[in-house]
Amino acid sequence: MDSSNPPIHKDLRFSGEDWYGREFGAERFENCVFIDCDMTEITTVGTVFDHCEFRGVALNASVHDTSRFDNCVFSDSSLFGATLRHCKMTGSQFRATAMRPLTIEGGVWSWVNLFGADLRNINFDHLNLEESDFGEANLDKATFRGAVLQNATLRGASIEGAVFTGADLSGVQLAGLNWRKARIDGQIAMLIAESLGAIVDN
């Protein structure tokens, strides 16, 4: 395959495909729909999925390196045991999709909709999560060390035991969250106090 001219798949519908263990390179899928496909243990390297839908797709134990899932929708799917390394997930939505255990190593997850997701124990350290929606998600014991959460939504999320040390929480509505057992640093403690109406003297 000529890597300088990767294949482009547009406006296609894939239903019931058995792609177990398939390897995807620098190819591009645009406005494609994947329905009830088995993509268990697939690997993607530099693959682009743009405005694609994954409905009832098994992505268990799949590995993705420097791939992009831009503005994709995952519904009733499974990422059990998947690994995403330096992937771009901007604007993607996850609905009734199994997300754990999940390994994330770097990447951009801004504007991602994870509303109501079970994200316990997942490591989001040093990720760009700007404007992402974690509303009503279970974030117990998840870690966000050094993550960028500017203007993210955490309303109604459970954060018991979560770690936010070094995270950027500017623009986040912090009042109303139960911070019991969550790990924070001095800067975040000040933001929480100010969100509750306290006047913090420097």
Residue ranges and their predicted role:
Residues 1-202:
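Tandem repeat scaffolds
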